[in-house]
């Protein structure tokens, strides 16, 4: 058994998985755990592991968000966890100051020249004004796409407002919606495939090199 109690970017658990050793990795942040999950899935086709300490279903996500309403530190961990679902890089790099409406970033394009701004909402009350705000942020920042990542299902006016932003076109690729509403439920099921990006580049979380298949099973703790 290989134990890494401060697994960070996951180098040790990656090596243990490659050597077909049983392993346990532990880290204190959801961002690190999300990074390691992605690294293992990218590198090993049939990897199996259990992650403890993160929401496993929508009820768990709602519980985590509710705790964050009373504890800002916990809220930031919810935000980082939500961003990790779609492999987005935190927009404020973990700082707790004003984020100017930018909770996360995704990059795309042949040279990673494109940028999608992510806004995370954990509250029960979401509305069309938030979609307008996100549209204003991407226009201010010169970003191509805005992603509204929400725990609560969007209303019809929100969906209509997002559709009104039109399409983003990158030469050589199919157009995608300029404003995309993605629920946490969708992100938990589809991961980074929940967001439509042309020629996506995972600059926030570099893709691990593909390793030979292994059937070993590990465990990842938070």
Please annotate each region the language model reported.
Residues 1-32:
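Extended, hydrophobic alpha-helical segments in both membrane/secreted and soluble proteins
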Residues 24-222:
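Mixed-charge (Asp/Glu-Lys/Arg
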């Amino acid at each position: 058994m290989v134990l890494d109690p401060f697994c960070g970017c996951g180098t040790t658990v990656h090596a243990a998985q490659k050597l077909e050793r049983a392993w346990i990795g532990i880290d204190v942040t959801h961002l690190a755990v999300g990074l390691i999950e992605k690294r293992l899935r990218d590198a090993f086709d049939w990897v199996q592991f259990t992650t403890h300490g993160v929401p496993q279903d929508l009820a768990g996500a709602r519980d985590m968000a509710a705790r964050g309403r009373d504890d800002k530190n916990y809220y930031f961990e919810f935000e980082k966890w939500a961003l990790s679902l779609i492999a987005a890089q935190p927009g404020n790099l973990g700082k707790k100051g004003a984020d100017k409406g930018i909770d996360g970033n995704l990059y795309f394009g042949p040279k990673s020249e494109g940028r999608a701004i992510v806004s995370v909402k954990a509250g029960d009350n979401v509305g069309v004004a938030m979609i307008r705000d996100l549209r204003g942020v991407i226009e201010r920042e010169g970003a191509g796409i805005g992603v509204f990542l929400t725990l609560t299902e969007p209303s019809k006016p929100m969906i209509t407002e997002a559709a009104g932003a039109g399409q983003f076109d990158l030469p050589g690729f199919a157009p995608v919606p300029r404003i995309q509403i993605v629920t946490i439920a969708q992100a938990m099921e589809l991961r980074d495939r929940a967001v439509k990006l042309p020629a996506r580049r995972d600059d926030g979380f570099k893709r691990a090199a593909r390793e030979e298949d292994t059937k070993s099973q590990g465990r990842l703790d938070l």
